[in-house]
C-alpha cells in the first residue's frame, strides 16, 4: 500500500474536510511543532475554533531546528507548508511565547485539549553528563545544543576529535555534519 509520513491519509486526500462539527467546539493545541500545527489545522478545517499555544517565538518545532543542519535544510519545507496552511484558516488563532499552563488553557474554554509538546533527547546514563551537556563551560552537546551552536563550529576541524553517542538517524546526521568538516569521528 501507498504510505506517506507527512500525510497519513494520502489515499483519502481531503475527505475529512467535508465533515464539519455540528456544534460550537473549542480546541486548544499545546505546542507549535509539526504535530501541533497539523492538529490545529485539521481541527480548524472541520470547523472548530482552534487556539494553538507555542511557548517559544517560532513555529515548526524540531523539524525547523534540524533543518539548520546544512544537509537537512529541506526539512524546513514541511513546517513552512503547515504555517502557510494555518495562515489561511480564519478560525485558527496562534499564540507564540505562550505556555500551555492550566490558566492559559482555561481562557479558551476548551472542549478538547491536544498535547503536542514534543520530546527531549534521551541521554545515556553517563555519570556527570546532565551537568555538562549544553553547558558553556564544556564541549558536550545534545542535538538541540549542537544545532543552537551550529554556526559556531569551525569549517575545518582537521585533527580535532569528535565522539558521537548514538547511531540512529540523528547520530548519523551529526556524523555527516562533522565529517564534512574533516573531524576525526568516533
Regions found by a protein language model. Give the residues of each.
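N-terminal Rossmann-like dinucleotide/flavin-binding domain of flavoprotein oxidoreductases
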Residues: 63-110
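Short, contiguous acidic/charged loop-to-helix segments that flank catalytic cores in large enzymes
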Residues: 17-19, 24, 65-77, 147-154
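A short helix-to-beta-strand connector/capping loop
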Residues: 86-94, 133-139, 183
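Rossmann-like dinucleotide/flavin-binding elements
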Residues: 21-52, 95-109, 117-126, 143-186
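Short acidic/His/Gly/Ser-rich catalytic and metal-binding motifs that mark active-site loops
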Residues: 13-15, 59-63, 123-124
Amino acid at each position: 500500500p501507498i504510505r506517506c509520513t507527512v500525510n497519513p491519509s494520502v489515499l483519502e486526500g481531503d475527505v475529512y474536510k467535508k465533515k464539519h462539527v455540528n456544534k460550537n467546539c473549542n480546541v486548544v493545541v499545546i505546542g507549535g511543532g509539526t504535530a501541533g500545527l497539523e492538529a490545529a489545522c485539521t481541527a480548524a478545517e472541520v470547523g472548530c475554533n482552534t487556539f494553538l499555544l507555542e511557548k517559544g517565538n517560532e513555529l515548526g518545532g524540531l523539524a525547523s531546528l534540524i533543518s539548520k543542519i546544512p544537509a537537512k535544510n529541506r526539512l524546513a519545507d514541511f513546517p513552512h507548508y503547515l504555517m502557510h496552511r494555518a495562515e489561511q484558516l480564519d478560525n485558527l488563532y496562534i499564540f507564540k511565547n505562550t505556555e500551555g499552563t492550566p490558566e492559559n488553557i482555561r481562557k479558551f474554554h476548551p472542549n478538547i485539549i491536544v498535547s503536542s509538546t514534543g520530546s527531549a533527547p534521551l541521554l545515556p546514563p553517563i555519570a556527570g553528563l546532565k551537568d555538562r551537556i549544553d553547558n558553556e563551560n564544556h564541549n558536550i552537546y545534545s542535538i538541540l545544543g549542537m544545532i543552537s551552536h551550529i554556526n559556531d563550529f569551525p569549517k575545518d576541524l582537521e585533527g580535532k576529535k569528535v565522539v558521537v553517542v548514538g547511531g540512529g538517524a540523528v547520530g548519523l546526521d551529526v556524523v555527516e555534519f562533522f565529517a564534512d568538516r574533516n573531524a576525526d569521528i568516533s
